[in-house]
């Protein structure tokens, strides 16, 4: 089932960025948050942003020029390269990462996203449609749910259930088009509390079911 497949995805930690980022990669929440980032960075609408998965993590960016050629950045999936780029920009400085071998990495795959199998993408698009505080709500609910999963308190699929529940609760409220920082922080705390309460209710329900 999906839970087993997602756990298998977690095994391959190419970037070595820690457990939280590993789970977000398995659930595609990292891509969901990148949809929101792209909207603000490039002033795009949700429908202008497509998502594909590149399992090998070799190509890190691509830019298509007006002659339909594509410029790409390729390297080993190693954060040391990214850090060296940030520290040295606009110059290139030597990193401690190994060189990329195109012989060893001769298979480059690109996979379309299925929103049914990966609800995180739909959550991101719904958050952009709702606007206002919803992206902050999405992020907060995910952080709590992932924390509970890492602590073996919930199953993987309940990450999605928790986020969906919290977003639906918030969707019934009024959102400001341009919320203040104070309002964003308040929504963040409220979403975290709603997530904890929802998970607690699931535990209570499961415990009651075990009695009968």
Task: Locate predicted features.
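Helix N-cap / loop-to-helix initiation motif
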Residues: 24, 34, 45, 134, ...
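Internal, well-ordered alpha-helical segments in soluble enzyme and binding-protein domains
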Residues: 31-34, 59
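C-terminal substrate-binding/catalytic lobe of Rossmann-fold NAD(P)-dependent dehydrogenases
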Residues: 40-141
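Conserved anion/nucleotide-ligand pocket segment
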Residues: 4-8, 12-29
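C-terminal helical cap and adjacent loop that interface with cofactors, partners, or active-site loops
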Residues: 104-201
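Single conserved hydrophobic/aromatic residue that forms the stacking wall/gate
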Residues: 1-7, 11, 203-212
């Amino acid at each position: 089932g999906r839970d087993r497949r997602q756990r298998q995805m977690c095994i391959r930690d190419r970037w070595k960025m820690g457990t939280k980022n590993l789970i977000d990669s398995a659930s595609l929440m990292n891509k969901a948050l990148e949809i929101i980032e792209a909207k603000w960075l490039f002033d795009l609408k949700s429908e202008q942003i497509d998502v594909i998965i590149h399992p090998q993590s070799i190509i890190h960016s691509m830019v298509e020029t007006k002659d339909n050629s594509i410029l790409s950045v390729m390297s080993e999936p190693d954060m040391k390269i990214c850090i060296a780029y940030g520290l040295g920009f606009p110059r290139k400085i030597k990193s401690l990462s190994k060189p990329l071998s195109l012989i060893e990495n001769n298979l480059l795959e690109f996979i379309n996203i299925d929103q049914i199998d990966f609800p995180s993408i739909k959550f991101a698009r719904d958050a952009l449609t709702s606007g206002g505080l919803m992206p902050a709500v999405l992020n907060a609910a995910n952080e709590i749910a992932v924390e509970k999963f890492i602590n073996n308190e919930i199953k993987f699929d309940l990450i999605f259930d928790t986020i969906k529940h919290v977003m639906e609760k918030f969707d019934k409220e009024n959102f400001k088009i341009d919320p203040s920082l104070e309002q964003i922080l308040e929504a963040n705390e409220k979403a975290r509390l709603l997530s904890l309460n929802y998970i607690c209710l699931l535990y209570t329900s499961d415990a009651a079911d075990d009695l009968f």
